[in-house]
């Protein structure tokens, strides 16, 4: 590591990946993954990356919260790429990392979210669609949106 790199805060790149895996990634997302020294993600996400990618693959433990706190400094000098489902900034790991470490420590390369994909399939305008996330929240939040009146 160069001396000027030691003075910079460690950065993490978060890459959104869809169910279509490697084939659905943009060239920018592929380059980020191919250039990684360390890949973090779920076992399923890591399995979507071709074996030719030489990065060390580390699946998230459960719970993954303590590991997120340690990123990005857990792998000094390494290019760390975190794989995320769809859009990492829609109730995803990208949001968590930015909250923990600030936007200056995280680069995000998004993929279409499940919301965007569902709206496209149904022909609905995303901006006219109510989205209720129950990720880490009570299912009671859904009730007002699915009951009459």
Task: Write out the residue ranges for each language-model feature.
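Short, hinge-like loop/turn segments at secondary-structure boundaries
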Residues: 57-59, 123-127
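Post-transcriptional modification and biogenesis factors for structured RNAs
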Residues: 149
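Class I S-adenosyl-L-methionine
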Residues: 1-117, 135-141, 146
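Structured adenosyl-cofactor binding patch, chiefly the S-adenosyl-L-methionine
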Residues: 117-123
């Amino acid at each position: 590591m160069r001396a000027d790199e030691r003075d910079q805060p460690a950065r993490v790149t978060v890459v959104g990946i869809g169910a279509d895996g490697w084939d659905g990634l943009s060239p920018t997302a592929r380059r980020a993954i191919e250039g990684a020294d360390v890949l973090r993600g779920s076992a399923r996400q890591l399995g979507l990356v071709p074996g030719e990618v030489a990065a060390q693959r580390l699946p998230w433990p459960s719970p993954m919260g303590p590991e997120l706190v340690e990123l990005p400094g857990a792998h000094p000098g390494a290019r760390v790429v975190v794989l995320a489902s769809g859009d990492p900034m829609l109730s995803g790991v990208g949001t968590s990392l930015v909250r923990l470490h600030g936007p200056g420590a995280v680069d995000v390369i998004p993929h279409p979210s499940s919301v965007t994909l569902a709206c496209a399939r149904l022909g609905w305008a995303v901006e006219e669609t109510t989205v209720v996330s129950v990720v880490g929240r009570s299912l009671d939040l859904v009730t007002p949106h699915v009951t009459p009146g």
